[in-house]
Amino acid sequence: MERALNLAEEDLFHKSLSASAKRMESAFRPPQGLDLSQPGDRSPLHCYDGPDPSDLLRHHQHHHQASSGALGAAGANEALALAAANMCAKFGESAGRVSVAESSGGEEQSPDDDSDGRCELVLRSAEHRAQAGLKVDAPCATGGGKKSKEQRTLRLNINARERRRMHDLNDALDELRAVIPYAHSPSVRKLSKIATLLLAKNYILMQAQALEEMRRLVAYLNQGQAISAASIPNPAAAAAAAAAVALHPALGAYEPAAAVGYPFSTGLPTATSCPDKCALFNNISSSLCKQCTDKP
């Protein structure tokens, strides 16, 4: 009797277990049109990853809704889609960690030791892919090193050229300060670059203005020397001019200037030489004329 009761309890246990397994299988079965099999992108250590609490919560909610009816089935499909997205993202991060560990030559230990050998094939394929990636990336790394070295050399050359240019500019400005007045006096501190250039500009403009005034004066003197000495204005002015010329011959250059204001002739004979000018006036002694006294 007890044995029959035990068999009945065992049959009931197995039946309930199989029913639970079927319900779990139906809950985890992907809907139509959704393919979760991605052997190329899955992590080789996906069998060691622990379940995500959020995924378990979603599965529990989905199982509860599946038992309630068709509305629960629709929620299960949405939950499975979200779970698939989370699992893909998690597997992508795991694959990235594994590729980094394999490229660095280290070995990543699994926290669990109860593996049943289902990931061996995936591990081998991932190892082959990692080795192929290392072989392909090796020339790229060499080329990147050469490129960075060339860029560093180019940057150093540009910096050296700019440094030489600044040194030449500073030397030129120092030479300019040395020749400009008021730029190197003890009471004035060292001028800046802009102040030096402005002072040089003003100094050049001042020199140009002075040169222009000098040219006008020379032209005026040349024009006065071309006028004939016959245009002496009046006897008094002629006497004063003759006396001035007798005292100093260089003052004869200013005689035509007076004639410009008085263009009328006085009727006096033209005197071209110093003795003739001295002979025109009897009241002026010829001994005062330097040219007459210097002649033998």
Swiss-Prot record:
Residues 153-207 form the bHLH domain. Residues 26-70 are annotated as: Disordered. InterPro entries: bHLH_dom, bHLH_transcription_factors, HLH_DNA-bd_sf. It comes from the Eukaryota. GO terms for molecular function: protein dimerization activity. It is found in: Nucleus. One of its GO terms (cellular component) is nucleus. Keywords: Nucleus, Repressor, Transcription, Transcription regulation. The keyword Nucleus applies. May act as a transcriptional repressor. This is Class E basic helix-loop-helix protein 22. The lineage of its organism: Eukaryota, Metazoa, Chordata, Craniata, Vertebrata. The gene is bhlhe22.
